[in-house]
């Protein structure tokens, strides 16, 4: 009893979908992430002066997957109630873009566990610019 041809096609489709391109993202996901980052780092975007944990500073042993994991944890803050600062509450479009960015990060391999050192902080703008640089390196 073998597999029927339709089942083989479906299994191959799922295998292709789960294959890791660049940390699990295909070019379209990376393009979407970079597009969102371009929007939220644009000139005059409100709320980007707020402080977030500075998690994108890499040491010698830090892998790119770990940096992405940390960045995802920072972006997750904007889904939680305490991450919605008065500025973001007044500028819901920025909040929605940050939440959209977090959702776009789901294509990234989240199977690793990472820790965040929250003792140092940076501006949201600097965090997003650093994240954009990392994503653009993957895209090129």
Curated annotation (Swiss-Prot):
GO molecular function, one term: growth factor activity
CC per GO annotation: external side of plasma membrane; extracellular space
Localisation per UniProt entry: Secreted
Positions of disulphide bridges: 25-107, 47-87, 69-114
A GO BP entry: transcription by RNA polymerase II
Protein family membership: Belongs to the IL-4/IL-13 family.
Subunit record text: Interacts with IL4R. Interacts with IL13RA1.
Protein name from the UniProt record: Interleukin-4
Species of provenance: Mus musculus
């Amino acid at each position: 009893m073998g597999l029927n041809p339709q089942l083989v096609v479906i299994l191959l489709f799922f295998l292709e979908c789960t294959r890791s391109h660049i940390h699990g993202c295909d070019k379209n996901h990376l393009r979407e992430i970079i597009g969102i980052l371009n929007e939220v780092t644009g000139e005059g975007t409100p709320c980007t002066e707020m402080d977030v944990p500075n998690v994108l500073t890499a040491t010698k042993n830090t892998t790119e997957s770990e940096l992405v994991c940390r960045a995802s944890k920072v972006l997750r803050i904007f889904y939680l109630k305490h991450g919605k600062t008065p500025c973001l509450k007044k500028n819901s479009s920025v909040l929605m873009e940050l939440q959209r960015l977090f959702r776009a990060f789901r294509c990234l391999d989240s199977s690793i566990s990472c820790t965040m050192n929250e003792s140092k902080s940076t501006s949201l703008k600097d965090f997003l610019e650093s994240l954009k640089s990392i994503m653009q390196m993957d895209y090129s």
